[in-house]
Amino acid sequence: MQTVLAKIVADKAIWVEARKVQQPLASFQNDVVPSSRRFYDALQGARTAFILECKKASPSKGVIRDDFDPARIAGIYKHHASAISVLTDEKYFQGSFDFLPIVSGIAPQPILCKDFIIDPYQIWLARFYQADACLLMLSVLDDEQYRQLSAVAHSLNMGVLTEVSNEEELERALALKAKVVGINNRDLRDLSIDLNRTRQLAPRLGSGVTVISESGINSYAQVRELSHFANGFLIGSAMMAHDDLNAAVRRVLLGENKVCGLTREQDAQAAYESGAIYGGLIFVEASPRAVTEEQARKVMAAAPLSYVGVFRNASVADVAAKSEALSLSAVQLHG
């Protein structure tokens, strides 16, 4: 270990010892109950798995989301995530263990404690605060440490996301029989990103291992391309940086898509619930799906889509008037 990673881990060791004094294991260990949310099962299946992350800041970007509200974030993520990751590191990510029960109380998915875990105490603490899984990084742990920590996690019915960043760590993960392996595309030694890491390492993992691609995923195109190599993705910064978190999640997970020809409120609601970002309103009288301005208002009030006005051979004045009156997000012109 060196540079950024070594500094973080050294500071984490100091934090752990201080927290043990502040909140001794003996003070809460008897109150810890095993998890009932199955992290491993949540990532299985034919569909791509998404671990969506609650992250306020990072060493590479600084503060990512000023109005960080874990309850609001969980309320959005619960409609899309397979599992939810919560940063608990205080110094470098402005996280907190207090965020775990907030997210767990709102979202029914398994909650992953994302931290630099080097001591069994941290796993007990994570479960006490309602985490259902934890991250174990082979870049900071030797095999014996990993075995000890994963045994503690499994004894509490918690899942383990085993993180690797190179071939050596991947071989270790296989030898250690890791069930879920996260390939970190970020080099924590210098914070650089290389998506080729997923392309190169994932094929080395057998069919019995769930592969998660971590870091640097910020578009639907990347998700589609890398889904040939990975079973799922851990995504945080790409969404946390956007004011409209709901739309950001949809863009990355489902892509930019439009459902056109909306004429009824229930159509708009169905489109939104299915993941659409844009809703098309046709202002062409000859179209069987044409709407009046009054109908358009009712449709728009039914669901928070970004609405697109569709026109054919319309005058500039007409397009401008309807766009302004309805506050359309975009127009689509034909003719």
Regions found by a protein language model. Name each.
Residues 118-130, 165-176, 213-235, 240, ...:
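Catalytic cores of alpha/beta
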Residues 128-145, 182-192, 229-252, 276-289, ...:
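Glycine-rich phosphate-binding active-site loops on the catalytic face of alpha/beta enzymes
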Residues 51-69, 110-118, 160-163, 213, ...:
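Active-site mouth loops of central-metabolism enzymes
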Residues 11, 55-57, 89, 116, ...:
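Active-site beta-loop-alpha junctions enriched in small/polar residues
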Residues 46-50, 80-82, 107-110, 131-132, ...:
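Short, well-ordered coil/turn segments that N-cap beta-strands
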Residues 1-60, 246-262, 266-269:
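N-terminal amphipathic alpha-helix/helix-capping segment at the start of soluble metabolic enzymes
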Residues 61-154, 169-172, 198-201, 284-335:
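N-terminal active-site wall of soluble small-molecule enzyme domains
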Residues 195-205, 227, 239-260, 293-302:
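C-terminal helical cap(s) of enzyme catalytic domains, especially alpha/beta-barrels
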